[in-house]
C-alpha cells in the first residue's frame, strides 16, 4: 500500500501542523467541534486547543495486549488524558482502531478500562466487505456481533462507517444505543459503498456525519458530506423524501453532539 510507508515517515510536527490546517479548514466551513483518532500523543489535542476548538480525541489503539506496541499505545492514551484533564474544551475516548487491528485480549483490556473509568469508546466498524468476511471466517460472527459478544457495547460507543450491516447488526446497534458516524464521501472515494441510513433511522439509531480524513475525502467541509448524505439515499431508494434536509441537519448537529457528550 501507499499509506503505511508515508505514515511511518510522519513526525509529531507533521501531525501538529496537519491538524492545525485541518482545524482552520473546519472553522472556515462552520465546524466548531470534532472527534479524531490519531497517531501522535498530544499533537491533535494541542492543535485543537490552539485553534480554540472543542475536540474529543482518541489515541488510535492497535496491536495486542503485551505485543505489537498495544500496551504502549494504551499508556500514551492515558498520559494524554492526564495532560488535558483541566482543559474544558478537550475530552477523550478510548479508540481501538478496528477488530482486524486488535486481538480479543487487547479489546477486552480496553473495554475494562472504558467501563471502569467511564470513558466512551470509538471504533471503525464494518467499513469494508473484506472486514466482514474475515470476521465471519475468524469468529463466525459479523464485526458487530463479535463486538457485542465480548461486551464492547456495554460502554457508550461511537462506531465509524457501519457500511456493511445485516439486519441483526442494526438491531444490536439500536439495542445498545450505539451512535453511528457515517462518512459518505470517504466511503464512496474508497469504493466501499455507504451506510444504510434509512434502515438505521427506522430502528432509532443515533446517526451523525463525519468527513473521515483529508486522505480519504479531500475536504473536511462537513456540508459536502451532508449534501451527499441526503442525495445518495434519495437516488438509491428512488424517493425524493428519503433522508430529508431536516434530518441531515439533525445528524450534523444535535445527533453529533449527543454522540460526543
Spans of model-derived segments:
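His/Asp/Glu-enriched, well-ordered alpha-helical/loop segment
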Residues: 149-156, 198-261
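A conserved active-site cap/scaffold subdomain adjacent to cofactor or substrate pockets
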Residues: 167-168, 174-205, 209-211
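Metal-coordinating catalytic core of metallo-dependent amide/deamination hydrolases
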Residues: 43-163
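Divalent metal-coordination and catalytic microenvironments
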Residues: 30, 48, 94, 124, ...
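A structural motif
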Residues: 29-31, 53, 118-120, 177-178
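Alpha-helical scaffold segments that flank or form the walls of functional sites
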Residues: 1-52, 74-86
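Histidine/acidic-residue-rich catalytic or RNA/ligand-binding cores of hydrolases
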Residues: 129-141, 169-174, 191-200, 217-234
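Structural detector of well-ordered beta-strand residues that form the stable sheet scaffold
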Residues: 34-35, 56, 122, 158-160, ...
Amino acid at each position: 500500500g501507499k499509506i503505511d510507508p508515508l505514515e511511518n515517515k510522519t513526525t509529531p510536527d507533521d501531525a501538529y501542523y496537519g491538524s492545525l490546517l485541518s482545524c482552520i479548514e473546519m472553522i472556515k466551513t462552520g465546524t466548531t467541534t470534532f472527534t479524531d483518532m490519531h497517531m501522535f500523543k498530544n499533537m491533535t489535542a494541542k492543535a485543537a486547543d490552539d485553534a480554540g476548538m472543542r475536540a474529543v480525541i482518541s489515541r488510535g489503539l492497535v496491536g495486542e495486549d503485551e505485543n505489537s506496541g498495544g500496551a504502549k499505545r494504551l499508556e500514551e492514551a492515558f498520559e494524554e488524558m492526564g495532560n488535558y484533564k483541566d482543559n474544558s474544551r478537550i475530552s477523550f475516548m478510548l479508540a481501538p482502531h478496528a477488530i482486524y487491528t486488535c486481538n480479543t485480549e487487547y479489546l477486552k483490556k480496553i473495554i475494562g478500562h472504558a467501563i471502569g473509568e467511564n470513558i466512551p469508546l470509538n471504533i471503525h466498524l464494518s467499513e469494508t466487505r473484506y472486514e466482514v468476511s474475515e470476521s465471519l471466517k475468524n469468529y463466525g460472527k459479523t464485526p458487530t456481533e463479535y463486538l457485542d459478544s465480548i461486551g464492547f457495547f456495554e460502554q457508550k460507543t461511537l462506531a465509524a462507517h457501519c457500511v456493511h450491516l445485516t439486519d441483526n447488526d442494526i438491531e444490536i446497534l439500536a439495542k445498545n444505543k450505539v451512535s453511528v458516524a457515517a462518512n459518505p464521501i470517504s466511503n464512496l472515494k474508497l469504493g466501499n459503498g455507504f451506510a444504510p441510513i434509512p434502515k438505521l433511522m427506522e430502528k432509532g439509531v443515533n446517526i451523525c456525519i463525519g468527513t473521515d480524513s483529508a486522505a480519504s475525502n479531500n475536504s473536511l467541509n462537513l456540508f459536502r458530506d451532508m449534501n451527499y448524505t441526503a442525495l445518495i439515499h434519495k437516488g438509491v431508494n428512488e424517493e425524493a423524501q428519503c433522508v430529508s434536509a431536516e434530518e441531515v441537519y439533525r445528524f450534523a448537529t444535535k445527533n453529533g453532539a449527543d454522540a460526543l457528550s
